[in-house]
Amino acid sequence: MQDLINYFLNYPEALKKLKNKEACLIGFDVQETETIIKAYNDYYLADPITRQWGD
C-alpha cells in the first residue's frame, strides 16, 4: 500500500483519473480501486500523529 501512496504522490494526475473513474488499477476491479482510493484518502487526510495502517 505504501508503494501506491508514493505513486499517487508522484503522479497526482493518475490519482485524479482513478477518482474520476477514467482509469483503474491493473489487477483490480472498479470496486477494489475505489476501496484503495478511500484507504488512501483516509490515510492521507489523517492527522500525521495518528496515521497508521490497520493491524
Swiss-Prot record:
It is found in: Secreted. It comes from the Bacteria. One of its GO terms (biological process) is establishment of competence for transformation. Trp-53 is modified by farnesylation, which is essential for activity. Modified by the tryptophan prenyltransferase ComQ before export to the extracellular environment. The type of isoprenyl derivative differs among the different pherotypes and depends on ComX primary sequence. Keywords: Competence, Lipoprotein, Pheromone, Prenylation, Secreted, Sporulation. Changing T50A: No change in activity. Changing D47A: Induction of srfA is delayed approximately 1 generation. Residues 1-45 form a propeptide. One of its GO terms (molecular function) is pheromone activity. One of its GO terms (cellular component) is extracellular region. A lipid is attached at W53 (3'-farnesyl-2',N2-cyclotryptophan). Changing G54A: No change in activity. Interacts directly with the sensor histidine kinase ComP and stimulates its activity. Part of a major quorum-sensing system that regulates the development of genetic competence. Acts through the activation of the two-component regulatory system ComP/ComA composed of a sensor histidine kinase, ComP, and a response regulator, ComA. Activation of ComA leads to the direct regulation of over 20 genes and expression of over 150 additional genes, including those involved in competence development, appears to be controlled indirectly. Under certain conditions plays a role in sporulation. The DNA sequences encoding comQ, comX and the N-terminal two-thirds of comP show a striking polymorphism, which determines the specificity of the quorum-sensing system in the different pherotypes of Bacillus. In ComX, the sole conserved residue is the modified tryptophan essential for the activity. This is ComX pheromone.
